[in-house]
Amino acid sequence: MEQAPNMAEPRGPVDHGVQIRFITEPVSGAEMGTLRRGGRRPAKDARASTYGVAVRVQGIAGQPFVVLNSGEKGGDSFGVQIKGASDQGASGALSSDSELPENPYSQVQGFPAPSQSSTSDEDPGAQWNGKLLRSQSQASLAGPGPVDPSNRSTSMLDLAPKVASPGSTIDTAPLSSVDSLINKFDGQLGGQARGRTGRRTRMLPPEQRKRSKSLDSRLPRDTLEERERQSTNHWNPSTKYNNHVGSLKQPAQSPSPSPLSGFSRARQTQDWVLQSFEEPRGRAQDPTMLQFKSTPDLLRDQQEAAPPGSVDHMKATIYGILREGSSESEASVRRKVSLVLEKMQPLGVISSGSSKAMAGQGELARKVEELQRKLDDEVKKRQKLEPSRAGLERQLEEKTEECSQLQELLERREGEAQQSSKELQNMKRLLDQGESLQHGLETQVMELQSKLKQVQGPEPAKELLLKDLLETRELLEEVLEGKQRVEEQLRLRERELTALKGALKEEVASRDQEVEHVRQQCQRDTEQLRKSMQDASQDHAVLEAERQKMSALVRGLQRELEETSEETGHWQSMFQKNKEELRATKQELLQLRMEKEEMEEELGEKIEALQRELEQARASAGDARQVEVLKKELRRAQEELEELQAERQSQEVAGRHRDRELEKQLAGLRVEADRGRELEEQNFQLQKTLQQLRHDCEEASKARGMAAEAEATVLGQRRGAVEAALRETQGDNDELRRRVLGLEQQLRETRGLVDGGEAAEARLRDKLQRLEADKQRLEEALNASQEEEGSLAAAKRALEARLEEAQRGLARLGQEQQTLTRALEEEGKQREALRRSKAELEEQKRLLDRTVDRLNEELEQIGEASKQALQQLQAQLEEYKEKARREVADAQRQAKDWASEAEKSSGGLNRLQDEIQRLRQALQACQAERDTAQLDKELLAQRLQGLEQEAENKKRSQDDRARQLKGLEEKVSRLEAELDEEKNTVELLTDRVNRGRDQVDQLRTELMQERSARQDLECDKISLERQNKDLKTRLASSEGFQKPSASLSQLESQNQLLQERLQAEEREKTVLQSTNRKLERKVKELSIQIEDERQHVNDQKDQLSLRVKAFFRQVDEAEEEIERLDSLRRKAQRELEEQHEVNGQLQARVKSLEKDSWRKASRSAAESALKHEGLSSDEEFDSVYDPSSIASLLTESNLQTSSC
């Protein structure tokens, strides 16, 4: 133990640490007190021998770590060695018994266990003072047999959790440092390879891989707990702990005490080792899947080898492979071995529980993915269904409203059915009462027959009766007076009864009429309902088609609205641009007007100048024709101006008239829209009136039931009164029994009455059967009507929705009409502005044409004047030539005459020659100027031709504009004609609507008549019922009357009357049915007309949309025309500028001509003066025809040609 630090010096610096080494023992075995040190054993020898594990806990720079080794490198030494920084032993490192791990090699008696030899890295001199005791084998450790505590050895895994005292604190910082070191080694291994890579990568077979499970820090907690349970089955942990303490106390007493630093370091390393053993307990796995063998303790005489697949075997093989041929230290090799094992353990320690957990995690991940997908799908569906949710909610609300309405209708129908059932029950009661009355009458007849038989009995009974009759005669005389009184009372009662009979007859007749009328109404209602069902089915199909059409129309209208919105935006921008352009044109027109005024002023000045020149020309030439021509042109110009003003006024009046007509048409369209709305309101009112009529019918049926009940009560009261009267009459009959003969006659009469009553009862039964059949039919009709009413309600809703859509469409049309009217007004205003601008431009053009004509005339006049001037100049030149010739001839003569004076005149001759040359040059220059004047004249002619062509082009453009204006006027006329047609159609629609109103009024009057007829029939029915009651009462009281024949005749006559009334009522019913059918046909025709009108309105909408498009196109054309007019205006401005330039040139020319005329006048005056004076001397000739004057004349001619 003392040489351990010296041995550790060549392996690097060691701060402190604990080394625990368990080494093998041969199979042959030696004595317990001796331990042999052998060399490195191969894997095969290790199988048959014991093995051990070396655990080194060292600190490198204060960071501890763990290295596990099989212990094959060193000798077969056993023991626990605690190393410190000093050279002292480890005895002082153990301060208490509970803080150190148990020494498995300590003896039981308490003597120290010596170590005969140590590993290569331990102190060879350290020895154990005791011997190892042999205990059970590895297989016996797991057995249930008891073991003596003195002969056993525990594993490190069993000791680790028991050594740590509750007072000691476990520091977790070394674990993080171990992980960091492992990561460092991983990085180093990834970058550099230490040792021999070939041997390091070599893998041994699983048979040779051994490991010590006593030091496996990666084992799960459950296996440890199982082993502890097995260990607790064998012995008590208190004895084990005591044995462990005793074994540790004995070797701790032999060496000398160490300082406190060594003790603290040893304690830290010991705590760290215990913590490393306790850490794997947190990583528990399934105990069933991880069944490892218990770690064998190094007991005495242990000869079994570790299994080939164990961790110790693997560690030993890896350590041997890494140790062979490597010069590294043992600590580094052990580090590498521990790292390799740590990396290999996850591969070998995967259990089925972890595989199940992984499979469960995979399934959970799949489920999570599926749920996430479902959630995404649901979110997408919700996002898709959110826009349709609002529509569905609206539909649900509509359906709920419809259901509520249907429930209300069902409740109403149920109430009506209950009322009809009550009426049927009342009728049944009345029938039962009639049958009971019939039975009573039959019993009365039977009693009367029995009495008659008794009266027709034997003769003694007759004699007794005769005696009784004689006795009664006396009594009768007394009773006659009372009888007369009674008869008077009876007469009064008969009168009352006749009145009641009449009332009953009327009631019965009215009741029968009501019943028949109700039956007919039911039949009509059923027929109407059938027809309405058929019509509803047809209407449903038509409505579906119309819905599709309306949807298509709505889509088209939406598209058109979008297009129109875009077009309106475009047009608004265009209108704004046009407004700006119009403003610019207005400004330009104002400028043009100013320029025009300036031009007019200039032209006035020019005209005044021309007039002055004309006056001068008149004074000079006296050309009166030109003045007249100018006057005529002025008159024509004034007339044209007046005509243009009149045309402009007429156009303005026509435009105002058209605007008024357009406003009227728009007002008519608005009136038509209002009429359409009124028609829709009237249709709605008609539907309301139909519903009211149905409601009135229902109330009438209820009133009938109530009236029947009231009549039944009244009849019961009357019957009670009649029964009381009958009782009184029976008392009278009892008193008048003696009148047998009258009774027989009365019996016969009563038999006849009974027969008639039976026939009446049979008739009543037939009527009741008919009524029941009618009732069944009515119930069926009611059911059908309910169904039809449901369908009609749906159709009505559809129609209402359709009407709302139509109203919306009409509102949209109204808005479109308003926009169109505004656009038309704006177009009218623009047209007026265009017309005004056009008129102004035309006026300007005419003025320009006139000015151009005037200028052309002036140019022609100037050309003629220039021609005349040229002719005059030519004549003057010829005269000059002739004069020169004459002068030359005179000079020659004078030369001949004055030869003597030749020398004197030589200088003059030279001068004359020079002058002749000059004159020749001047003549050449005049010819050149003449040529230039001709060229200028040709250029002027070309310019005039160009101006004429431009004037022709302007005329053509004006013609094109006139054509375009005519086309626009034709379009406007067409539009006016179309508006007239629309007015006519609107008038026709209004006529149709008025007719429909008249028909509706007629239908209302007819319905009122039918109601009155129904009331009459009800009254007749009531009277007939009263008559029937009277007849029944008469039948009941017929026993007490003496004259039944008259009553029978009256009854027969009444029956005949009733039959006639019934026939008349049937005829009236047929007539009413025919009228109802006619009314139904009329209603159908009206509905067809309304549908036609709707279609016509839709067609009108389409036509209006087309017209709107045409209007937009016309606006486009108008804009193009405006652009054209702008271009023409610009061209006119350019032409005006050119004409200004031409006018300036003409003014310069006129000025030059004025100067020339002035010079000509001065020359003519000079020539005349010369002729009068008759120049004779050469000096005067020289003075007159000096070169300066000739040059001035030539320069003036040049100026004239240049000005041209």
Swiss-Prot record:
Q: Which UniProt keywords apply?
A: Acetylation, Cell junction, Coiled coil, Phosphoprotein, Tight junction
* UniProt feature, compositional bias: Basic and acidic residues: 207-231
| Record PANTHER family | CINGULIN, CINGULIN-LIKE PROTEIN 1-RELATED
Location of Phosphoserine modifications: 95-96, 98, 135, 137, 140, 155, 165, 214, 217, 258, 276, 338, 351, 1176-1177, 1183
Intracellular or extracellular location(s): Cell junction, Tight junction
Would you indicate the residue range of the signal peptide? Answer: none
Q: Where is there biased composition of kind Polar residues?
A: 93-119, 232-245
Taxon lineage:
Eukaryota, Metazoa, Chordata, Craniata, Vertebrata
Which region ranges are annotated with the description Tail? 1162-1204
N6-acetyllysine carried by residues: K579
Q: What is this protein called?
A: Cingulin
GO molecular function terms here? microtubule binding
Major place of residence: other
The UniProt function text for this chain reads: Probably plays a role in the formation and regulation of the tight junction (TJ) paracellular permeability barrier.
Q: Name one GO cellular component term.
A: bicellular tight junction
Which ranges are annotated Low complexity under compositional bias? Answer: 247-261
Map out region (Head) in residue numbers. Answer: 7-357
Pfam families, from UniProt?
Answer: Myosin_tail_1
Species assigned in the record: Plecturocebus moloch (Dusky titi monkey)
Q: What is known of its domains?
A: Deletion of the TJP1/ZO1 interaction motif (ZIM) decreases but does not abolish colocalization with TJP1/ZO1.
